[in-house]
């Protein structure tokens, strides 16, 4: 529901000056969840049956430190690609440092003789990677597709359909199909998934559906709003089906005692892929659009009557209200149309890029093992404050 309410409440908050409540509402909800967990949640003991004091001693602290000092600068470097050129030290240095420490982390996990490694090798190699690695890759790619639509669709709304964002109420209305599509896909999985079964092929089919219609956003123009709305809805419906199924399949690729490990690793895959996708898509969209603006705007402005001697001055204020104020309405209209056409090129390249990632996701989904045998009503463990707690092996 947050993906439906969030865009609308966020924009409304900006317009009426109460945007902070979008964050306060989330903080209040999280605090209530914390209280519920604190007073009502009594989880079963760790499946390894290890006492807490022993667990604290045997945690892989070195691996944790290596991962943190590797992942943080790596993600910083990726995010910085949206701000600085790719050869800038702000980008290169964090990437090099991050890759170095993540390589050290991988070697530590592989070769150090640890009682409880954070990333046991057998989790990745089980069934030649079909149990966990393939589902985790599929999960990562599915999450990347959410970001492609979440970048492209608002860009279309703002640039093509709402006069640069001035008609914000209509923009809010156009943002709703994406959220409702995710709800539709997730609901359809819950209703029809257990009837269809064949979970591996459900995942493959939903990822293919998501990738197909998400990639078709490359057909975007200033004048095909209805078609693009349909493609966004269909793609995000596939996403809603695929994302929750991918989470479940990746969790089920390990033994019960390793659920915490699979959950943690698949979560890293998912959110790291999301950060990478957001940075890659934003960089491509920005750079491609700017390159085409430099190609299209001067000729469009000159054709609208702007003297060539003023082109340089115009290019400095493209995208601001100063265009109409300093160069007239006719030139401003020509520039706006040229910027929109440049944005079309940027959207197209991002959609093509997402297709490349999507193909990897489809292949990974097809390589997953079917988890039908685990999709049953058997309960492995019980909460310690329930009448069935005595059935737990560890307490």
Language-model regions: role of each:
Residues 5-14, 228-309, 349-353:
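Small-residue-rich alpha-helical segments with characteristic i,i+4
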């Amino acid at each position: 529901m947050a993906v439906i309410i969030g865009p609308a409440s966020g924009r409304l908050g900006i317009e009426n000056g109460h945007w902070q409540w979008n964050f306060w509402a989330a903080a209040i909800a999280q605090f209530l969840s914390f209280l519920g967990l604190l007073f009502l949640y009594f989880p079963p003991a760790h499946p390894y049956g290890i006492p807490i004091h022993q667990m604290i001693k045997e945690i892989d602290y070195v691996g944790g430190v290596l991962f943190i000092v590797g992942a943080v600068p790596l993600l910083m470097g990726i995010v910085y690609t949206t701000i600085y050129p790719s050869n800038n030290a702000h980008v290169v240095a964090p990437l090099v440092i991050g890759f170095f420490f993540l390589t050290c982390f991988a070697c530590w996990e592989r070769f150090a003789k640890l009682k409880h490694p954070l990333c046991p090798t057998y989790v990745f190699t089980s069934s030649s990677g079909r149990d966990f690695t393939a589902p985790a890759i599929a999960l990562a790619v599915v999450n990347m597709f959410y970001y492609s639509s979440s970048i492209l669709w608002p860009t279309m709304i703002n640039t093509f359909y709402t006069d640069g964002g001035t008609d914000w109420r209509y923009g809010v209305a156009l943002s709703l199909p994406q959220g409702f599509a995710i709800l539709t896909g997730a609901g359809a999985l819950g209703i029809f998934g257990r009837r269809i079964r064949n979970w591996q092929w459900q995942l493959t089919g939903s990822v293919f559906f998501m990738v197909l219609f998400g990639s078709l956003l490359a057909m975007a123009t200033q004048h095909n709003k209805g078609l693009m709305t349909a493609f966004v809805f269909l793609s995000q419906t596939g996403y809603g089906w695929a994302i929750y199924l991918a989470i479940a399949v990746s969790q089920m690729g390990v033994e019960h005692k390793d659920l915490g490990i699979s959950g943690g690793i698949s979560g890293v895959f998912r959110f790291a892929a999301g950060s990478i996708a957001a940075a890659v898509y934003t960089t491509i969209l920005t750079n491609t659009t700017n390159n085409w603006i430099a190609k299209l705007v001067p000729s469009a402005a000159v054709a609208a009557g702007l003297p060539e001697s003023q082109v340089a001055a115009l290019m400095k204020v493209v995208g601001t209200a100063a265009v109409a104020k300093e160069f007239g309405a006719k030139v401003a209209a020509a520039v706006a149309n040229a910027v929109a056409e440049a944005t079309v090129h940027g959207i197209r390249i991002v959609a093509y890029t997402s297709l490349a990632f999507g193909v990897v996701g489809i292949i990974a989904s097809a390589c997953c093992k079917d988890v039908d045998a685990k999709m049953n009503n058997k309960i492995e463990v019980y909460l310690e404050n329930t009448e069935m707690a005595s059935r737990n092996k560890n307490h």
